């Protein structure tokens, strides 16, 4: 009976230690992200970013973005190299906060709120960014993600841009 009480106390202490220990899987990790996507109307988007994850999969993202809007060539009547690459393009630098709203075993989803500034090769342009990221955790910390994004453009030719981006996240190994 005495041995049973000792074992019971040891098991209880072990269970309390397991419950009281905080899990730090992927907290405070950094990633390099690259994504490409299609945006309405007639646009393509490429984003390179650094993401710093804080507690509970919330994250800060610092990004560089390039957007190109193509159109038909007026003389040829179809899309040409010049009407694709030289029609309207913007680049921008920005920051976004991404609070986690959904978690599963190997997936999580985050809202994305941010702002950015850049140029359309003629003048200063700004954006208010809103969206949703869905992330799937792969081996060795890599992640695959898709993102629904909407941008409110300030001082640009587009008022709204919305679309879908797909990309991957590479862990940097730093915490």
Please give the residue ranges for each predicted region.
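Solvent-exposed loop/turn segments connecting transmembrane beta-strands
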Residues: 34-47, 87-89, 117-127, 152-161
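Extracytoplasmic loops and strand-loop junctions of Gram-negative outer membrane beta-barrel proteins
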Residues: 30-34, 77-81, 148-149
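Gram-negative outer-membrane beta-barrel domains
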Residues: 121, 129-175
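Short stretches within intrinsically disordered, low-complexity N-terminal or propeptide regions
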Residues: 15, 20-24, 40, 98, ...
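Cleavable N-terminal export/targeting peptides
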Residues: 1-29, 172-175
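Gram-negative (and chloroplast) outer-membrane scaffold detector with strong preference
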Residues: 51-144
């Amino acid at each position: 009976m005495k041995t049973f009480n000792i074992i019971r106390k040891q098991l209880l202490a072990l269970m309390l230690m397991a419950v009281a220990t905080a899990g730090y899987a992927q907290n405070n990790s950094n990633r390099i992200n690259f994504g490409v996507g299609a945006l309405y109307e007639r646009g393509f988007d490429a984003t390179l970013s650094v993401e710093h994850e804080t507690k509970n999969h919330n994250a800060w993202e610092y990004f560089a973005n390039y957007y190109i809007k193509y159109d038909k060539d007026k003389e040829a009547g179809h899309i040409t190299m010049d009407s694709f690459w030289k029609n309207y393009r913007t680049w921008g630098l920005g920051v976004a906060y991404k609070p986690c709203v959904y978690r599963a075993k190997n997936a999580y989803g985050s809202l994305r709120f941010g702002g950015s500034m850049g140029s359309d090769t003629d003048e200063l342009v700004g954006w208010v960014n809103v969206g949703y990221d869905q992330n799937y955790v792969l081996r060795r910390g890599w992640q695959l993600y898709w993102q629904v994004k909407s941008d409110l453009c300030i001082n640009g030719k587009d008022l709204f841009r919305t679309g879908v981006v797909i990309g991957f996240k590479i862990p940097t190994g730093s915490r």
